[in-house]
Swiss-Prot record:
The lineage of its organism: Bacteria, Bacillati, Actinomycetota, Actinomycetes, Mycobacteriales. The keyword Metal-binding applies. Pathway: Amino-acid biosynthesis; L-histidine biosynthesis; L-histidine from 5-phospho-alpha-D-ribose 1-diphosphate: step 9/9. GO terms for molecular function: histidinol dehydrogenase activity; NAD binding; zinc ion binding. It catalyses: L-histidinol + 2 NAD(+) + H2O = L-histidine + 2 NADH + 3 H(+). NAD(+) binds at residues 136, 200, 228. Signal peptide: none annotated. Binds 1 zinc ion per subunit. This is Histidinol dehydrogenase. The active site is at 342 (proton acceptor), 343 (proton acceptor).
Amino acid sequence: MNMMAKFQMSRIDLRNRVLSAAQLRSALPRGGVDVDAVVPKVRPIVDAVAQRGAQAALEYGESFDGIRPETVRVPRELLSQALENLDADVRAALQVSIDRARAVHADQRRTDTTTTLAPGATVTERWVPVERVGLYVPGGNAVYPSSVVMNVVPAQTAGVDSMVIASPPQGQFGGRPHPTILAAAALLGVDEVWAVGGAQAVALLAYGGTDTDGAELAPVDMITGPGNIYVTAAKRICRSQVGIDAEAGPTEIAILADHTADPVHVAADLISQAEHDEMAASVLVTDSETLAEATDRELANQLATTKHVERVTAALSGKQSAIVLVDDIDAGVRTVNAYAAEHLEIQTVDAPGVAGRIRSAGAIFVGAWSPVSLGDYCAGSNHVLPTAGCARHSSGLSVQTFLRGIHVVEYDEAALKDVSGHVITLSKAEDLPAHGEAVRRRFER
């Protein structure tokens, strides 16, 4: 591993430069994926599944991966069996993750509110859960039982009555999803799992169909969960049919650090997210050139013993990753706010104070003892977060994702009469006189 001794992340030097937020976004590294480019390839898949249901989904799965399960829906007994066979330590860790996530998400549940505007005039905002949700759990480079937890817990807490998990079938497991995925579903009390992945899974969730044994595969009202570029494209296409959480891109970490940060921690955290994907983004923003150099040396040391060294090295060397040098922490705050990272670590003097100045991040991890890996598994927070700068306008998955606010308007005769003149005036101003007539005629005798 001598070549790793010379490993160095690319540098972006923003010192002595005064840049606007838009200029910062242009200067900062960002890879991402071109979803538009694959939409034409994915649309025929979605159309075929919309027309032919499970048959088309199974055909596409077989052509792409060489795997065709006997049925789309995994028999319930296999879920129970997977839980029974789950490693005891993994089960205990999953239970801790579930318990902590439930505690955090329970505090997110909104309550109905009623506003009384005048005697006999009320508007109530009633929060109602989505009725049926499809939760996508990817396959690929890793197994993600944690994604089962992060999708299911907020949906259950919101009160969603019906949910289905879709996850790619695995050849080594008889055309079923990975047993750890099945076990996590069983541990959470979810008994409907579909062995289908990719764009065809999203389409089948959106449009439903009939399984090979004649059982109904009911469509959902909303689809959540991350996936590859084809899954993202399918979600974009299907969003006129169902709701979606977001168009998730490759994972990303930004670390805002000063001279007090430990380069061992910084390097380990950059590597931890680079482990996901060759397109993963790892960005260090610092006012300390000494820390930047020490982090490079520590990256070389740790890469020598990293299991997925090729994948990690590709991610750290990609155009989406860099060490960004800034004049001071104030400039660093402006920089990370412009970047709007999925995960942002603060490793500085007065980390809580600095964190309080952050306005754009999917999740903020404060201090040396709050690594992103904690949030991935057992912090209690949700790890399904906005990527590609979307944290400037969007939030991570939460109980609110699965709730709909419905306004319930109730006026009595006197309350309507009191405001009727204003309604009629505004309807005339908008040249929609029938609106006013609908009120006026109620008071004709």
